[in-house]
UniProtKB/Swiss-Prot annotation:
Observed phenotype of the null mutant: Cells exhibit slow growth in the absence of nicotinate.
Active-site residues, Swiss-Prot/TrEMBL: 110, 211, 243
Encoding gene, per UniProt annotation: BNA7
EC number: 3.5.1.9
Source organism superkingdom: Eukaryota
GO MF annotation terms: arylformamidase activity
Biological or metabolic pathway of the protein: Amino-acid degradation; L-tryptophan degradation via kynurenine pathway; L-kynurenine from L-tryptophan: step 2/2
Annotated motif HGGXW, positions: 36-40
Function recorded in the entry: Catalyzes the hydrolysis of N-formyl-L-kynurenine to L-kynurenine, the second step in the kynurenine pathway of tryptophan degradation. Kynurenine may be further oxidized to nicotinic acid, NAD(H) and NADP(H). Required for elimination of toxic metabolites.
Entry text on domains: The main chain amide nitrogen atoms of the second glycine and its adjacent residue in the HGGXW motif define the oxyanion hole, and stabilize the oxyanion that forms during the nucleophilic attack by the catalytic serine during substrate cleavage.
Protein name: Kynurenine formamidase
GO biological process, one term: positive regulation of cell growth
Pfam family, one: Abhydrolase_3
Subunit note: Homodimer.
């Protein structure tokens, strides 16, 4: 897999695989940036996962008020977390600069939602101690208006309690153990609260009742922590298909469009 990735692009962050579903125009008010999932390691999940959903949003956007992009990142085991997170952050930052984007809406599915959650927790480290990638996360928080977390993974502890067999992919992304995942909700919620408040970011949680790979346990775990800190969020539960149907679902597209326009 790693040889295939390197052959595709000399850019290790794969920026040249960024997809444009809807280009910026003079009427653009909102930018949507998609981050695909795939358990950190599945090459079958790509930026093109969101093609159908993005085209549905484009068909609704009769006044061309939205632009839409989807970014790529390297996979495990070639690299481990947080390096793949940093790939995503680097590519989003570059896209924002090249296109002059403001009013960002980040949409992540599965591990893509995990990445967004990790970005929201960026304030866990003092700014003077932040790495370049962490400073980029801080910069993104300043222009992100909404996040849409679709059937996401938020707590690796809860994930492996419910699905011990998922260790087959978590150990690829976290070879030194899931304790290296620093964004367990119960641990970072004070910093997420600070970010949501300071930067006025709206959080949307979406989950399909028919998801065969993730039950509601992940979403409910996150909701419990959000409620403990009395944080505002919106929840959309529906039959949105199987896990890999969610990012194609027309009802999800309408939910996103209705909440950004």
């Amino acid at each position: 897999m790693s040889n295939t990735v390197r052959a595709i692009s000399p850019d290790i962050t794969l920026f040249n695989k960024t997809l444009t579903f809807q280009e910026i125009s003079q009427n653009t008010r909102e930018a949507v940036i998609y981050i695909h999932g795939g358990a950190w390691n599945d090459p079958e999940n790509t930026p093109n996962d969101f093609n159908q959903l993005a085209n549905t949003i484009k068909s609704m956007d009769t006044e061309s008020t939205v632009c839409q992009y989807s970014i790529e990142y390297r996979l495990s085991p070639e690299i481990t977390n947080p390096r793949n997170l940093y790939d995503a952050v680097s590519n989003i930052t570059r896209l924002v600069k090249e296109k002059g984007l403001t009013n960002i809406n980040m949409v992540g599915h599965s591990v893509g939602a995990t990445f967004i959650w990790q970005i929201l927790a960026a304030l866990k480290d003092p700014q003077e101690k932040m790495s370049e990638a962490q400073l980029q996360m801080l910069g993104l928080l300043q222009i992100v208006k909404r996040v849409f977390l679709l059937d996401g993974i938020y707590s690796l502890k809860e994930l492996l309690v419910e699905y011990p067999e998922y260790d087959c992919f978590t150990r690829l992304a976290f070879p030194d153990g899931i304790q290296m995942y620093e964004e367990e909700p119960s641990r970072v919620m004070p910093y997420v609260k600070k970010a949501l408040s300071r930067f006025s970011i709206d959080m949307h949680l979406v989950h399909s009742y028919s998801d065969e790979l993730l039950t509601l346990r992940q979403t409910n775990c996150l909701i419990s922590c959000l409620q403990d800190y009395q944080l505002s969020f919106k929840l959309y539960l529906d039959d949105l298909g199987l896990h890999n149907d969610v990012y194609k679902n027309g009802k999800v597209a309408k939910y996103i469009f209705d909440n950004i326009c």
